[in-house]
Amino acid sequence: MIKIAPSILSANFAAMGEAVEKLKAQGADWVHFDVMDGNFVPNITFGPDMCKALRPLTDLPIDVHLMVEHPSEWIEPFKKAGADILTVHVESAEHHLHRALQSIHAAGMKAGVVLNPATPIGACVHLLPECDLVLLMSVNPGFGGQSFIPETLRKIRALRSEIDARGCDTLIEIDGGVNPETAKRCIEAGANVLVAGSAVFKAPDPAEMIRALRG
């Protein structure tokens, strides 16, 4: 079943708790939590304290996307904050990605890697045995509300082939410019999880939008 992970980066920050509380009833599967440090990407968002504050408000998995230079420094803080999934960028300053993924698993969380639009899937195939998921960025990271990059579809198909060839259970997650039209194309290409921010939180009826994204 296709999972939908609304990105709270696009929620009303003044009513964040209320928005998160509503997500399960609206049909969401995960809560996507974007962490930006102002260095790896040109924006600053949330940290472990926000995750900790939101944790009691939902039993949905919290999917933390670390857009930071040194992701290993944040494994323990996000474990303590109640995160369920932690993904790290292959483009970060993390020189020991295998070790980082193993540390995330040792902390009791699911682990994955993230690829920016310009990064080929070859950068992550050797990591697939350690990955519960691979997040493919379909926009350049840093800000919400961007348009989907069509080349992502080719990357999804190629990554799906690599995963299947290795007999892995790794999920493919897509983040950026996801709407009902692009969602359908991503699912057809082999995606399992769709991150949607503006599409969900700006919709007149978020529950209906989540149903439309799932297809």
Give, region by region, the residue ranges found by the protein language model.
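Short, electropositive alpha-helical surface patch
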Residues: D84-E91, I187-A196
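A short, acidic/glycine-rich surface segment
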Residues: T119-A123
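Glycine-rich beta-strand-to-loop/alpha-helix junction loops that act as flexible
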Residues: I174-G177, V195-A199
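Acidic, divalent-metal-coordinating active-site segment for phosphoryl/phosphodiester hydrolysis
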Residues: G177-A189
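Short gly/ser/thr-rich secondary-structure transition/capping motifs
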Residues: V114-A118
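Short basic/hydrophobic patches in alpha-helices and adjacent helix-turn junctions
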Residues: A158-E162, R185-E188
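Short glycine-rich anion-binding loops that position phosphate/pyrophosphate groups of nucleotides
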Residues: V139-P141
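Conserved N-terminal beta1-alpha1 strand-loop-helix module at the mouth
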Residues: M1-T87, S92-R99, H105-A111, C124-C131, ...
